[in-house]
Amino acid sequence: MDYRNTLNLPETDFPMRGNLPQREPEILQKWEEEDIYATVQKARAGRPKFVLHDGPPYANGDIHLGHALNKVIKDIIVKYKTMAGFDAPYVPGWDTHGLPIEQQVIKKLGVNRHAVSVVEFRRMCKEYAKKYISIQKEQFKRLGVRGDWKNPYLTLEKEYEAAQIGVFGKMARKKYIYKGLKPVYWCPSCETALAEAEIEYAEKTSHAIYVKFPVKEGKGVLTDENTFVIIWTTTPWTLPANLAITLHEEFSYVQVQVEKEHWLVAEGMLESLRSLWNLELPVEKRFVGKELEGVICKHPFIERDSVLILGEHVTLEAGTGCVHTAPGHGEEDFNVGKKYGLPVLCPVDHQGKFTAEGGAYAGMKVDKANPVIIEDLKNLHALVHEDKIKHSYAHCWRCNNPIIYRATEQWFASIDGFRKAALEEIDKVQWIPSWGKDRIYNMIADRGDWCISRQRTWGVPIPIFYCEDCGKEIISDETIAKVQEIFREEGSDAWFLRPAAELLPEGFTCACGGKSFRKETDIMDVWFDSGTSHTSVLMERKELAWPADLYMEGSDQHRGWFNSSLSTSVAAYGKAPYKAVLTHGFLVDEKGRKMSKSLGNGVDPLQVTKEMGADILRLWVCAADYKNDVAVSPRIMKQMSEAYRKIRNTLRFLLSNLNDFDPAKDRVAYKDLPEIDRWALLQLGKVTQRVLQGYEKYEFHWVYHSVHNFCAVELSAIYLDIVKDRLYVEGKNSTLRRASQTVLYDVLNALVRLMAPVLTYTADEIWPYVPGVPAGSHVQTEEMPEALPQWLDEALEKKWDTLLAVRSEVTKALEKARQDKLINHPLTAQVDLYPNAELEGFLRGIPNLSEIFIVSAVQLHSAGEEKPEGLSMAEDLAGFGIAVNSAAGEKCERCWIYDTGVGENQEHPTLCPRCASVVSHL
């Protein structure tokens, strides 16, 4: 008789191989056909809301790994919250305006933006943005991200733009919006102002020069003849705009002798200057900074005075302690100049070229003027020293060219108007990680006014008019309401298509009586676009809520979207738009280096999805401690693939042993389960608690490690290893087998749900195979499992901790015996145990030790019994010896256990008594 046919061998149609690149698109198609998003939302209607508000990615190019990390984290959160019983809508969005899209249109379509109409250029930009929205949308969906993809929010939509105008109007009504002449970050290449969030820092080599400014009027403090104040600058091109030299009122300054001249520098810099200039610089006089206020110098090459003033921003970190001050080219210079009533001189135009005010340098680009100015200083004997330095310098975020500080008339949002309220709101928000609070707090506390105007065309226009008669700026509740109404119907293109008269209320007149108006030509900063999504999206869409429960983006958004959203929300409504803010780090390779094309260390998420599957990528996101920088490489992805295989194989093994199990009628009550089964449920309870805690605290790596370790250790290496015999060999409907199947079912059912937010495709694939699952049901509409209190038996845990420590020592002894060729398989062995007195008492209370150790027999000797020679002594259990011997009896043909009872049953002479009994009852 072939006894193999009498075994309960595992069987399932659930595939062993994931084959994810082929299978996932089929599942995705099914989701789309069934409208999984609507199905889930319907299932959670009326439940408490949880709103994660999507920070909009830029509609430009294919998605990269940073996008994948961001969107998958959001998807894990939303899917978990849904399964935790919340109504958790997710409305994805896109940021669609701004310079990067303009640049791509110019570059890829070969368009000269000055040669086509504004309306036509904007149409091209819109088409470009929409193209990449469609591309990115499909790419995000392929990652398994569930959302309202049919109705995303786009910053170019007319409803969005109208709501944005409304926020601007609220800020203007509170006098937070003003026009001012002050230095702003300016990109000469892109010909526009930039916000702080549009600046990136990179290393740059600059000229560093020390220049003599001759004293013209010493005011009785300095002598007028042959006395010079020495300044230091790394931007020689700003010297034509110099109007003052700033000292610190409390610093000590010294007059030193250099041949027949007298030079003024800060005493704190003297030693470093002696070394750098290789001069002795003997001290002639000392002054305190405030004594020198009002001394007048002559500009070294322009007929103009340069006055000595005082400022707190002067430091002794570099230079001379005498700071070259050009109010038109620096924020600190501007602020100190304002205090002294200095004019704002900016002899540089929008292309970074000197204007006529630049004198001899007119028409020259500022970077080209540097060496010319230095040469002129040499010829005038005004150059003390010239050097080159490498330093971190501000560059444009899009064209990557160095930027300049340039005073221009711009529109600003006055941060001072609502700074205090914003700082108070920061205290009310939960910041994860907690250091994010200090970061954004300091940024808001130190932030200057926000330059919100841009000299471009692809964006939302600043809704301000000018009276042609008196030049007054026109903005009121009435004009804002009219523009908002038109934009809601026609979008912001109306600003460029209609004359001013049609955009203003009918019959509108200026206070001066004027009836002719022109429109502002600047558009809003894109950070104002995305920063008003709290109104345009959260307030406007009925399925969402304001404030959002969570904003989640990269940590660079403390100065970007988190900042602009907080600023506009507090300015308009006096409250933060979010209850909590979660940030993730940046991507690095295994050596901690940032991803870059030059290093060739990037990982393409689309390629990973194509070759391995989206669930592998999602598992990597889950495994990462994403709050810090996240390491990624092909090797790490391979590790994730292996971890996935372990989890999948474990789930498949569970399924394959449940092919005849009906949870409605085959379950065994908890009280009737053997200890090993109750121990497995204890472990399931613990892993369930840990996983749910990980989701709640956004510590998803807890989820990954808990599930992976549970599959690899508690299940595969212990429980499943032990009960395999029972599952295969015991009678099909025996209580012992059904007890194990009850546990397998509970473990499978829980694990699939616990991992569903992460392994979204695999959970969906396996769910219909789970016994008792209604046809057509979705795992995504299920709720998370819970750890039943009865499972969490502390006494049982303590007992099994000891028993598993013994098992571990036995396993080591068996492995040694196998290596020594004493046995070829654990089932050929009998284990003789020589415990200490305490352990003996413990082990005598454990039935079926052979089942737990997976050997044919166990002989437990008394503690007082003499231990034989050659005994293996346990490493971690004092006084515990183990001997491995060949098991007595014959090998059972059916279960492979050696038993002295093999042959007793004449009908089945090759079987042990247990197997003979089972077979006889078939």
From Swiss-Prot:
Binding positions (ATP): K597
Catalyzed reactions per annotation: tRNA(Ile) + L-isoleucine + ATP = L-isoleucyl-tRNA(Ile) + AMP + diphosphate
Pfam families the record matches: Anticodon_1, tRNA-synt_1, zf-FPG_IleRS
Superkingdom of the source species: Bacteria
Any one annotated GO CC term: cytosol
The record's free-text note on cofactor binding: Binds 1 zinc ion per subunit.
Signal peptide range: none
Positions with a binding annotation for L-isoleucyl-5'-AMP: E553
Motif ('KMSKS' region): 594-598
Cell compartments where the protein resides: Cytoplasm
Record's keyword terms, sorted: Aminoacyl-tRNA synthetase, ATP-binding, Cytoplasm, Ligase, Metal-binding, Nucleotide-binding, Protein biosynthesis, Zinc
GO BP field: isoleucyl-tRNA aminoacylation
Binding-site list for Zn(2+): C892, C895, C912, C915
Entry cofactors: Zn(2+)
Listed EC numbers: 6.1.1.5
Motif annotated as 'HIGH' region, chain positions: 57-67
Entry note about domains: IleRS has two distinct active sites: one for aminoacylation and one for editing. The misactivated valine is translocated from the active site to the editing site, which sterically excludes the correctly activated isoleucine. The single editing site contains two valyl binding pockets, one specific for each substrate (Val-AMP or Val-tRNA(Ile)).
Protein family per UniProt: Belongs to the class-I aminoacyl-tRNA synthetase family. IleS type 1 subfamily.
Protein name: Isoleucine--tRNA ligase
Organism: Desulfitobacterium hafniense (strain Y51)
Taxonomic placement: Bacteria, Bacillati, Bacillota, Clostridia, Eubacteriales
